[in-house]
């Protein structure tokens, strides 16, 4: 009888060991990518800079645009995904009780040799202001673990540089925006 229980214990533990899930990221705001082949990697983390730009037309003639941009240093992310690859992301938040669409943003950057930028807001000379100008990528999300979400982009990501931000719904005044960056190769 002992041998039967021992055998069942070994079989059960081996089944549970192979069904082990990917761990949640350690800190709120961190993001891990799950690739199509089930391998994982933490995304590159960058502290963003806020940048304001006045168009040439506004400088020369007084008519033009004033833009606010989110900028991170470096042309390219160190985390590269293959074009057309099916991916999911595990995003750690403060908790997973908030609608993820309200706190998680996936967006595309404009990449230059020394930086990556995304327009956050713009105002023209005539007073029209647009906010939330980021090129958002839609996604579906489910709760994952104790305080994370597993998110799946709703569209195939085109080649380019991308960022994910996670805001804290409990904090009224966030001082710095941390961007988790990745790239989709051509």
Predicted regions and their residues:
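Extended, solvent-exposed segments with strong compositional bias
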Residues: 121-146
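A glycine-anchored, Pro-Gly-centered beta-turn/N-cap motif
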Residues: 147, 156-161, 165
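Sec-dependent N-terminal signal peptides
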Residues: 4-13
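Surface-exposed coil/turn segments at beta-strand junctions on protein surfaces, enriched
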Residues: 82-84, 144, 157
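Aromatic- and Gly/Pro-enriched, solvent-exposed loop/edge beta-strand patches characteristic
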Residues: 142, 148-150, 169
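Sec/Tat signal peptide C-region and signal peptidase I cleavage site
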Residues: 15-19
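Primarily secretory-pathway and cell-envelope proteins
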Residues: 20-124, 168-186
């Amino acid at each position: 009888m002992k041998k039967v229980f021992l055998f069942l214990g070994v079989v059960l533990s081996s089944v549970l060991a192979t069904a082990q899930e990917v761990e949640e990221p350690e800190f709120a705001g961190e993001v891990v990518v799950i690739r199509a082949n089930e391998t994982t990697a933490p995304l590159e983390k960058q502290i963003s800079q806020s940048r304001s730009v006045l168009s040439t037309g506004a400088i020369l003639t007084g008519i033009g645009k004033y833009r606010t941009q989110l900028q991170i240093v470096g042309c390219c992310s160190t985390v590269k995904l293959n074009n057309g690859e099916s991916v999911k992301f595990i995003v750690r938040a403060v908790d997973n009780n908030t609608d993820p669409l309200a706190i998680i943003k996936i967006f595309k950057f404009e990449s230059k040799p020394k930086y990556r930028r995304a327009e956050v807001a713009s105002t023209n000379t005539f007073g029209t202001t647009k906010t939330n100008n980021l090129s958002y990528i839609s996604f579906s999300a489910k709760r994952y673990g104790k305080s994370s979400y597993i998110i799946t982009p709703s569209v195939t990501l085109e080649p380019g540089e991308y960022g994910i931000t996670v805001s804290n719904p409990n904090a009224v005044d966030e001082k710095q925006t941390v961007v988790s960056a990745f790239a989709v190769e051509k």
